[in-house]
Amino acid sequence: MSELLVYKASAGSGKTFTLAVEYIKLLIFNPRAYRQILAVTFTNKATAEMKERILSQLYGIQIGDKDSEAYLNRIKEETGKTEQEIREAAGIALSYMLHDYSRFRVETIDSFFQSVMRNLARELELSPNLNIELNNTEVLSDAVDSMIEKLGPTSPVLAWLLDYINERIADDKRWNVSDEVKSFGRNIFDEGYIEKGEGLRQRLRNPNTIKEYRKQLKALETEILEQMKGFYDQFEGELDGHALTADDLKNGSRGIGSYFRKLNNGVLSNDIRNATVEKCLEDAKHWATKTSPRYADIINLANSSLIQILEDAEKLRSKNNLLLNSCRLSLQHLNKVQLLANIDEEVRQLNHDNNRFLLSDTNALLHQLVKDGDSSFVFEKIGTNIHNVMIDEFQDTSRMQWGNFKLLLLEGLSQGADSLIVGDVKQSIYRWRNGDWGILNSLNDHIEHFPIRVKTLATNRRSETNVIRFNNRIFTAAANYLNGVYKQQLGKDCEDLQKAYADVVQESPRSTEKGYVKVSFLEPDEEH
């Protein structure tokens, strides 16, 4: 059965070498296989480097160049072909590719999806004269300027803008209206917003939507605070019924009474569960001082009711703290949501008026088409001759991109062709353009019913031994420390973190201990 091969490749581990070997192996079996392979990466520079690497190594293998010996040996080992067979096939493949270069598809993710869009333009009812806009910033700037120009004294947008400005002033932040709104408006290009944008715009067409939602959030906030205040009332009621006060308990006002007072004041954060609370949950003896004249009464009361009240409060406190914070954050940002939806609407209107299509909308449009439509139709337009898919820097792939690629991968796998993914979650740096390392981290044994085989490239050939050893120790320690913090707060290991750093330790091919690492500790200052 065909499989998806996943290479986890840390820095210096031979990722480009491995990709080129896997590509050339397909050509050795079939010199025209390049017509059925799609290799994608993130930058034009990486695309050019990959093309150059494949072509130069094909030539090197053909003529017996020493620089291509490592490629030849790996291909011999993994294909079972003789050296002569590999050299001949490499020469034939190189000749075919040079005379059929347009079908040698190593390209960026963006350029691939653009080509798909061109093939689907008619079905998507996109005008043939449509202007493709590459610069989101310029479009956003025009939209915000247009929105501000339209503001009138009674405009709800003006009220939202004023709220936004007041919030910035309260936080001692810059409040240049135009620049700040443009900066905030970049959120409309985030995939999280794009996926929910249409539903949000539909709901906000009702002018009462935000008002009703605000009312619901306020009611939930009040309900949570009253519920937690109820535990303080129970605690005080039990003490009062036995002629006791919180000062009679162990450590007086600094003891367990402090916990319940915080609940009464609406403080539900995790740090109020301190050592005193832990001890009082464990044993009634921690509720009273041994020298207290009411020692026996307090112990009996703790066993009969106070410990139970504390346990009940703790069962709800953590969950209610999350709900309370969610309510308050939502209330804080409701006006921003309205403002964002208005900016989005203005961008769409300007695009329509100027017969313009944003390049950044490509992924979203294809994602919607693939999700709602007939995938076989999409494959027909893309070109069903793509069998093998190779994706480089996969840790920076976005959810929408993965949704689009996944169907292409599954189509190739169903035809008996293997596909390849290369990435390293520890090097994910493209969150600003919706990259999601969690996709690679969550690829386990199967994709649908097709098996996934994971290989880790563990040898770092780029760095010196001392540098490798330092990195092994520092990142192992850092991952363990963060997992400890996570476990302390949530009571369980952070499985995503553990999985991401399970392969952090690299090996060195060198026996000599060379390399130098210097660590400097910086003191925090007002700016940082």
Label for each model-derived stretch:
Residues 18-32, 409-411, 447:
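Walker A/P-loop NTP-binding motif
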Residues 2, 7, 41-42, 58, ...:
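Conserved ATP-dependent motor core of P-loop NTPases, especially the RecA-like helicase ATPase domain
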Residues 4-8, 38-39, 46-47, 105, ...:
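Conserved helicase NTPase motor core
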Residues 27-42, 414:
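Conserved SF1/SF2 helicase motif Ia
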Residues 153-167, 171, 254-346:
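Coupling/switch/interface segments within P-loop NTPase motor domains and analogous charged loops
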Residues 37-54, 109-110:
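Conserved Walker A/P-loop ATP-binding site and its immediately adjacent core
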Residues 173-179, 457-528:
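Helicase-core coupling region on the C-terminal RecA-like lobe
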Residues 2-21:
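Walker A/P-loop
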